[in-house]
Amino acid sequence: MEAVAEHDFQAGSPDELSFKRGNTLKVLNKDEDPHWYKAELDGNEGFIPSNYIRMTECNWYLGKITRNDAEVLLKKPTVRDGHFLVRQCESSPGEFSISVRFQDSVQHFKVLRDQNGKYYLWAVKFNSLNELVAYHRTASVSRTHTILLSDMNVETKFVQALFDFNPQESGELAFKRGDVITLINKDDPNWWEGQLNNRRGIFPSNYVCPYNSNKSNSNVAPGFNFGN
């Protein structure tokens, strides 16, 4: 993902990254701590304060959602061929995968990086995930089928836990404050159904809030995750 610096920042420790207002940074990880993101600028990596930058819109990035949960979301009846999401790669932390709906199934493509930090799936390389996604809206992500990326509305598909929830009955879904839950059913206004870490169950609707992938939720604790 990309972000634009809104203020100058001078690193205060070796693991932080300095930048100037107006710089465009590659955000490598924003899921471990909502206050400090891991980013790259001019080949250098380090942590940056999230309130010094403005994220470029990317509703397609869902962070630490598992491969299985990605498939649950993308196999819903309202999802069409080409609808996709980008997530952190389970087998290689810090790297990314693209999950795409195609012909009643979901295909997964690992995003590769070369020694210069450029992103690619096949031959064409890009400076950022944003550029890679934009390119594959008109050029297939697959070499065997024509699969063009297109957006789906994910904001209503996920909720984020405001509090810990410990089940009292069988069939309820346990979660921790900050967890992001795949929303399956909310026909009952008080008890919704969701999935987290390959577990499925119901939970109280007043324990969660809508999840926005582009903003850190100030109501939740640092270290929230997508159930990876």
Swiss-Prot record:
Cell location: Cell membrane
GO biological process, alphabetically ordered: epidermal growth factor receptor signaling pathway; male genitalia development; muscle organ development; regulation of cell migration; regulation of cell projection organization; regulation of MAPK cascade; regulation of nematode larval development; regulation of vulval development
One GO MF term attached to the UniProt entry: epidermal growth factor receptor binding
Null mutant phenotype: RNAi-mediated knockdown or RNAi-mediated knockdown in body wall muscles causes ectopic membrane extensions from body wall muscles.
Alphabetical UniProt keywords: Cell membrane, Membrane, Repeat, SH2 domain, SH3 domain
Entry comment describing in which tissues the protein is expressed: Expressed in body wall muscles, pharynx, intestine and hypodermis.
Residues of the SH3 domain: 1-58, 154-213
GO annotations of cellular component type: COP9 signalosome; cytoplasm; nucleoplasm; plasma membrane
Pfam family, one: SH3_1
Impact upon substituting residue 201 to R: In n2195; loss of interaction with soc-1. Partially restores normal vulva induction in let-60 n1046gf mutant. Partially rescues fluid accumulation in crl-1 e1745ts mutant
CDD domains, sorted: SH2_Grb2_like, SH3_GRB2_like_C, SH3_GRB2_like_N
InterPro entries: Grb2-like (IPR043539), SH2 (IPR000980), SH2_dom_sf (IPR036860), SH3-like_dom_sf (IPR036028), SH3_domain (IPR001452)
Phenotype when changing residue 87 to Q: In ay73; partial rod-like larval lethality. Surviving mutant have a thin body and no vulva. Rescues fluid accumulation in clr-1 e1745ts mutant
Domain SH2: 60-152
PANTHER family membership: PROTEIN ENHANCER OF SEVENLESS 2B
Family: Belongs to the GRB2/sem-5/DRK family.
Function: Adapter protein which modulates signaling mediated by several receptor tyrosine kinases such as egl-15 and let-23 probably acting upstream of let-60/ras. Negatively regulates vulva induction probably downstream of let-23. Involved in sex myoblast migration. Negatively regulates fluid homeostasis probably downstream of egl-15. During the formation of neuromuscular junctions at the larval stage, negatively regulates membrane protrusion from body wall muscles probably downstream of egl-15.
Subunit structure of this chain's protein: Interacts (probably via SH3 domain 2) with soc-1 (via C-terminus). Interacts with mig-2 (active GTP-bound form) and wsp-1. Interacts with mig-13; the interaction is direct.
Protein's name in the database: Sex muscle abnormal protein 5
